[in-house]
Every structure is written in C-alpha cells, then in structure tokens.
A protein has these predicted regions:
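Conserved G1/Walker A P-loop phosphate-binding module
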Residues: 1-111, 139-140, 145
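Flexible interhelical turns and helix-capping residues at alpha-helix boundaries
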Residues: 9, 131-134, 194
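Conserved Switch II/interswitch segment of TRAFAC-class P-loop GTPases
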Residues: 40-45, 72-82, 93-155, 168-182, ...
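Short, intrinsically disordered, mixed-charge
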Residues: 22, 54, 90, 94, ...
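Glycine-rich, flexible loop/turn motifs
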Residues: 23-31, 38-40, 48-51, 80, ...
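Amphipathic alpha-helical transducer elements in NTP-driven molecular machines
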Residues: 32, 46-49, 62-68, 82-96, ...
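C-terminal-of-GTPase-core extension/linker across diverse P-loop GTPases
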Residues: 2-6, 17, 146-353, 360, ...
Length: 366
C-alpha cells in the first residue's frame, strides 16, 4: 500500500512525513523544500504479531508495512506547470490513497504561501489542481474515442461515461463522489482512468498542541475541514505534526508518559496508520512459527488461495487447504496443538474468505 502526503508549502507536510518515517527528509521554511518525493516504509502497529512472537519464541517478528511518499508542495497553477507542476501530479497518480495535510494552526514564524490561514481556500487550491489534471486525462480519452464511438456501441457507452464524469468535475466535485453505473464495463473504465480525485483521501488537520486534547473540537479551522470533507466523501484526522516529530525521537515509555501529559491516549501516527488501513478496506492475516511471525496485508473479501499468493505466488497455484485459527483463540489456548484438540482450528478450502486476525497455516503442493 502506498499513500501520498500532499499539501501546500509550509503546512507541516514534510514534518509529518519525518514523524512517520524518522527519515529526516529536508524540511525548511520555504516553498518546495521537498524537490523529489521522499519515500519511507512505515510499520503498521499491531500488538497481535508481537504477542504471537512471544508465544512462539520466534527469531523474527515482521509487521505489515505502509509506504508513504512525501510529494512536493503544490501551488495554484500546478496543473498548468506552475511551481513544480505536472511532474508531481504524476507522483500522486501512483499512490493508492492521499493524505492531504491542511494547516489549522496559527504561527507568525512560519509563513503561509498565501499570507493567511484559511483551510477552505487551501483545500480548494489543491483540489482544483487535481480536478484540472483529471479533466485533462478525460479530454485525452474523449479525443481518442469520440470518432470511433459513432460506429461502436461499446465506445459510445464509454464516451457517455467519460463526459458524465467530466461534467461532474467541471461542477467542482471530486470523482470519488461520482455514482458510477452498476455494470462491469463502467466500473472497469472508471477505475482505468486512475483519476486523482477518485482516490480515497484523509485530511490531516494539522493543529497546535493545545488543540489535541479535544481533537480539534474548539478549533474553527478544523470545523471547516470537517464540513468540506463530509461534502466530498473524505475522512478527517486531527494531528499535531510538530508533537509527532518530537514523539518519534522518544522510546515507548517516554512516549506514553508524554501522551498522558498531553491528555491524549495514543499517538496520532498510530491512529493515522489505522485510519489508512480502514480507508482502503485492508485487513491483516498472520503467519506464525519459530523462524518468523509475520503480518500480511490483504483487501477485505480476499479468499484463502489469494492470501497464500501474498506470501509466494506458488502457494496460490498449488493451494490445497488452509488451517485457520482466530488469533485470540490461539493465544488463549497457548499453542496450535492445544487449539486443535479443542476443535477450534478450521481446515478451510479455496472459497474461505480470510478474516482480520486469522492465523493461517497453508497446505499446498507445487
């Protein structure tokens, strides 16, 4: 899974990225401090895999991961080549979802590219650039199929869809709020356009430390972000990127104490990773043994053979059965053999839909 962190210059975007990855990406108080997208791999917090490791006395514990990409600050006119231009819109097109950092804090020491704090304006600036870029994609598709569509019913049907999506965007709406017709062709075509505004989006409302305890409830800027997100089908997440950067330098005990002092239960980064999983409809299944305990990321609804293929493609091709036990049941019984004796380990076939927290031992023949 790859998430792109976007936002106007100086909203705290690279600070958030630094917190997530501890990568120390260049963060400076001027536009375009991020010239190339910085990429960082982040472990998905999952206590289950740690406890499994303890149960099995395993040599290695491997959590699932998310790839975060810090994409250079966009400005008005990016879709026409202003600032760092279309190069960075192309970088966003490669991600699975967008984390859009919006500045909701006042600080005279950190300049704003437009001179004042106005989240609604900032969101509209970025969204318009994404919309313009998407319209350009659709215009190219229209130009390619318009003539042939006069004699081809399938292309005529697609042309109708493309023009409807374009009209939706021209009305200032995001593609993710467009109701795609419920037929296979339309679904495939729409997905194939890979529109930026169709990507799942989380708005990260970057607040001052004082706004963390009440989750931004008393911050009018956050209220505006929430209002806009509701209209366009996006999620909202309140975070203080500066605090998160400080937390990233602490060990677990110090971090817990610091969070308690702030009146916050858990770090924003843990919540952001969890929210990203939820947004994309992802779950984790687990594999366990003395050599390694590992979490694997799959889409909700994935069947056992395809889950096996995440480990190794041969496993999917040669899939026979999957021995499955719920994580908590395994932990409560102390071992797989004890769980087998209790009759709570299932032997599942190719139609079994994997659940979050399943501990699976695959049987295969290749």
């Amino acid at each position: 899974m790859k998430l792109g962190i976007v936002g106007l210059p100086n909203v705290g975007k690279s600070t958030l990225f630094n917190s997530l990855t501890k990568a120390g990406a260049l963060s400076a108080n001027y536009p375009f401090a991020t010239i190339d997208p910085n990429v960082g791999i982040v472990s998905v917090p999952d206590e289950r895999i740690v406890k499994l490791g303890e149960l099995y006395h395993t040599k290695k514990v491997t959590p699932a991961t998310i790839e975060f990409v810090d994409i250079a600050g966009l400005v008005k006119g990016a879709s026409k080549g202003e600032g760092l231009g279309n190069q960075f819109l192309a970088n966003i097109r490669e991600v699975d979802a967008i984390v859009h950092v919006v500045r909701c804090f006042e600080d005279t020491n950190i300049i704003h590219v437009d001179g004042s704090i106005d989240p609604a304006r900032d969101i509209e600036t970025i969204n318009l650039e994404l919309i313009f870029s998407d319209i350009e994609i659709l215009d190219r598709r229209i130009a390619k199929i318009a003539k042939q569509a006069r004699m081809d019913k399938t292309l005529a049907k697609e042309l109708e869809l493309v023009e409807a999506v374009k009209k939706h965007l021209e009305d200032g709406k995001m593609a993710r709020t467009f109701e795609v017709p419920d037929d296979d062709d339309a679904q495939i075509w729409f997905k194939g356009y890979n529109l930026l505004t169709a990507k799942p989006t989380i708005y990260a409302a970057n607040v001052a430390e004082d706004d963390l305890a009440d989750d931004g409830a008393s911050n009018p800027h956050v209220a505006k972000v929430r209002e806009m997100a509701k209209e366009e089908g996006a999620e909202v997440f309140v975070i203080c990127a500066q605090i998160e950067q400080e937390l990233a330098e602490l060990d677990e005990d110090e971090k817990k104490e610091y969070l308690e002092d702030l009146g916050v239960e858990s770090s924003g980064l843990d919540k952001l990773v969890a929210a990203s999983y939820s947004l994309l409809g992802l779950i984790s299944f687990l594999t366990a043994g003395e050599d390694e305990c590992r979490a694997w990321t799959i889409k909700k609804g994935t069947k056992a053979p395809q889950a096996a293929g995440k480990i190794q493609t041969d496993f999917e091709r040669g899939f026979i059965k999957a021995e499955v036990v719920n994580y908590q049941d395994l932990l409560d019984n102390g071992s797989l053999s004890a769980a087998r004796e209790k009759g709570i380990v299932g032997m599942e076939g190719k139609d079994y839909v994997v659940k979050d927290g399943d501990v699976i031992l695959f049987r295969f023949n290749v």
